Amino acid sequence: MANSAQARKRARQNISHRNRNMSLRSELRTAIKHVRKAIGSADKNTAQAAYQASVATIDSIADKGIIHKNKAARHKSRLSSAIKAMA
């Protein structure tokens, strides 16, 4: 239990930061799912448009430190490879 005023404030901040981080992480997963769904639809133009939108989201979340920049690069690379592999 937080006893000092400083510890109580940090506990409050941790809750709000955790909620924000969970929301952003969910946004990341949703962006990736949209691209995967577009790839599954076999429409390359739609997939590329979804990919472009997701890249901005992925980079934004990586810049905020929610995920590591290498993880962001890995996601983008795999999505890009999947789009390039489309016929």
From Swiss-Prot:
Instruction: Tell me where the transmembrane regions lie.
Output: none
**Which terms does the record give in the GO molecular function aspect?**
small ribosomal subunit rRNA binding; structural constituent of ribosome
- For this chain, the annotated S-S bridges are none
Could you list the residue ranges forming a coiled coil in this record? Answer: none
Cellular component per GO, a single term: cytosol
Alphabetical UniProt keywords: Ribonucleoprotein, Ribosomal protein, RNA-binding, rRNA-binding
Q: According to the UniProt entry, which residue ranges have a biased composition of type Basic residues?
A: 7-20
User: Which superkingdom does the taxonomy of this entry point to?
Assistant: Bacteria
- Positions of the UniProt region annotated as Disordered: 1-25
Annotated GO biological processes are: translation
Please provide an example of a Pfam family that matches this protein in its UniProt record.
Ribosomal_S20p
InterPro entries associated with the record: Ribosomal_bS20 (IPR002583), Ribosomal_bS20_sf (IPR036510)
PANTHER family per the UniProt record, alphabetical: 30S RIBOSOMAL PROTEIN S20, SMALL RIBOSOMAL SUBUNIT PROTEIN BS20C
As for what it does, the entry says:
Binds directly to 16S ribosomal RNA.
Homology family: Belongs to the bacterial ribosomal protein bS20 family.
Q: What is this protein called?
A: Small ribosomal subunit protein bS20
Organism, scientific name = Nitrosospira multiformis (strain ATCC 25196 / NCIMB 11849 / C 71)
